[in-house]
Amino acid sequence: MSTTENRRMKLIRRLAAACLALVPWNTSRHADAAEPLVLAKTGYLFAGGKIDTSLPSSPMIGQLYAEFQIPQKLLHPYPIVMIHGGSQTGTNFTGTPDGREGWAQFFLRRGYAVYVVDQVARGRAGYWTQSYGPVTPPDLDRTLQRFAAPERYDLWPQAHLHTQWPGAAKPGDPVFDAFYATQFPSLTNFAAQQELNRDAGAALLDKIGLAILLTHSQSGAIGWPIADKRPNLVKAIVAVEPSGPPAHDIDFKGAPDWFADVAKTKISGLGDIPLTYDPPLKDGEQLSFVRQDKPDQPDLVRCWSQAAPARQLPNLKNIPILIISSEASYHASYDHCTAAYLTQAGVANTFIHLPDVGIHGNGHMMMLEKDSDAIAGVIGNWLDKALPGKAASHSAQR
């Protein structure tokens, strides 16, 4: 894609994002939160997995955990399946570390059924060393640098803009300690993460039927394969700062160089397990990638794309997709590359950079930050436009 075409597509996306923000949802919770949240049904389920008799005690492995809530006043036919990112669990969506309601409650109050996932080998899904292999533990310095206090480290150009963390963002602060207590070890093997959760996520959709996927960070690389495997069951994808950028991860170095590509190549462009491409790859064949000569602007990375002619992603192209990127996160430097990669592969998508719709100062954990409701409102606006129409009833498990 030429530099001129890149600029034109970026302008179109910004105009579309601005239009979405013109008629915002009522994101104030002062009235809603004062009222009890009335549920028609609540419960949990496990999806996927099998009993492994080759291991001592024959454990169940490969399953995810999902808790669901169905509001009494159900207004939308498709539930939202919320999938957390690396080092996290579903608690990312069920409340904030300073005690406010989370995105799960936000969308429940607006008439959506919600399924909140703990990924395979994480949280209530359970972890077995013999089956899943090594894990990477949460790290205090990385948690502060990437999530709670990037402005103190300046590892990427936008980090100094971070203002929305609800607290002092340091050990001993009750809000930070409440957040840090939620951090979990994650499987070290990214391909295993993605394969296990793709299969369990597909099994969840087989149980509950048509649904909206809301992914964040690491689970972005899970959402694409789930949709690729079950394209007829995914009504929309909301990818909140999805795992990226395409082809190569980034090491953040600070000024003046800022960015360095990680040598390892993502085999599907968007992750470490295969996706369905057209024309299909032959046995042993790999995707070929090329990098921009210059970034779209100085504070952004140079994007990788497919070498021409680009293969298409047929199983994703009929699914409405929203990619959201905040102002101060490390993703602010590269989420536009993910949007461009999908576009090149024939997958239409909406890219919203939050400052373009007047929402400033957020980091990567935006669903926990002070203005989390405003961001949920942007998502709600987009869903209203992408999936018009409402339904009076919806079964919790079909």
Where do the model's predicted regions map?
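Conserved acidic catalytic loop of the alpha/beta-hydrolase fold
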Residues: A191-I212
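N-terminal cap/lid segment of alpha/beta-hydrolase-fold proteins
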Residues: A34-L75
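Short beta-strand element of the alpha/beta-hydrolase
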Residues: H76-G85
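Short beta-strand/loop motif that positions the catalytic acidic residue
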Residues: I323-S325
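Catalytic active-site module of serine/aspartate enzymes centered on a nucleophile-bearing elbow/loop
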Residues: G361, M365-R398
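Short substrate-entry loop that stabilizes the transition state in hydrolases
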Residues: G86-D98, A104, R124, A247, ...
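Conserved alpha/beta-hydrolase
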Residues: R100, A104-G126
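Gly/Ala-rich beta-loop-alpha elbow adjacent to hydrolase catalytic centers
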Residues: L214-G223
